[in-house]
Amino acid sequence: MNEIVTKCPAKINLNLRILDKREDGYHNIQTDYQLIDIYDHLKFKSNKDRNITIESKETYLNDEFNTIYQSAEKLQKLMNENAGVVIEVKKNIPTGSGLGGASSNAASTLVALNKLWRLNLNKHDLIKIASSIGADVPFFVYGKNASGQGIGAVSYTHLTLPTKDS
């Protein structure tokens, strides 16, 4: 397997209860997350040069400070062999909109490279890595509508939402 293509969904917070402020600057919250049908598209192509290259029309993605690069770098450090990747990014989720585009991209990168590089990390391990990247990244690794508390990444329980028919 040399290539993986992913769709990175956006999310909305159905409700958001802001609680107390923590010593680390974050606020404790309670929220319900809903995945929505707006997607960024990422294509991962492995190579053996240990370079992480991001290709996008969005120039702000072409540096080492974005969540896609951070996610790839964290997994690359777990590799015993040369592993590089070219990541093509097509953005559809509006930047800075609160829809979780950067977090979704980070989570998709973790999941895709775990498979592409055959790291065999389980979901719990990926969520642990995700929490070091951003507060919403674990939700996207979890991949289902969920309730969150703490800074949003502390615990997730599956949230069942009513359908149009119920």
Label each PLM-derived region with a short phrase.
Residues 27-29, 150-156:
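Glycine-rich, charged/polar anion/phosphate-binding loops
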Residues 25, 141-142, 159:
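Short glycine/proline-enriched turns and hinge-like loops at secondary-structure junctions
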Residues 157-163:
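Conserved small/polar residues in nucleotide/adenosyl-binding loops
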Residues 81-152:
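Gly/Ser-rich oxyanion-binding loop with an adjacent helix/lid
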Residues 166:
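Conserved beta-strand-loop-short alpha-helix elements that form
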Residues 1-97, 115, 119-124:
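ATP-binding N-lobe of GHMP and related small-molecule kinases
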Residues 75-76, 113, 134, 161:
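Generic helix-packing signal
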